[in-house]
């Protein structure tokens, strides 16, 4: 087997330095999948919180409490 010369080692290191960023680009997104799902969960919780805090007032003075409109002051 042939020994590597200094020129061979430098060429190998140059090739490695050119390939390393592309390897990182391939593997980094899979590391952040958990963070993305956590962000979606927080966004959903915020949306549900905003929806539950909306004030509802009766549409008319009728006795049916199920007919409601959204209070325009909150928006």
Curated annotation (Swiss-Prot):
Keywords recorded for this protein, A-Z: Cytolysis, Host cell lysis by virus, Viral release from host cell
Q: Which InterPro entries match?
A: Micrvir_lysisE
Q: Cite a single Pfam family from the UniProt record.
A: Microvir_lysis
Any one GO MF term held by the record is: enzyme inhibitor activity
GO biological process terms on file = killing of cells of another organism
Function noted in UniProt:
E protein is responsible for host cell lysis.
What is this protein's name? Lysis protein
Its lineage reads: Viruses, Monodnaviria, Sangervirae, Phixviricota, Malgrandaviricetes
């Amino acid at each position: 087997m042939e020994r590597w010369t200094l020129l061979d080692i430098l060429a190998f290191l140059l090739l490695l330095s050119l390939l390393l960023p592309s390897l990182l680009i391939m593997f980094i997104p899979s590391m952040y999948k958990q963070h993305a799902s956590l962000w979606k969960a927080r966004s959903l919780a915020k949306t549900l919180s905003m929806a539950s805090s909306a004030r509802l007032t009766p549409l008319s003075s009728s006795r049916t409490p199920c007919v409601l409109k959204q209070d325009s002051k909150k928006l």
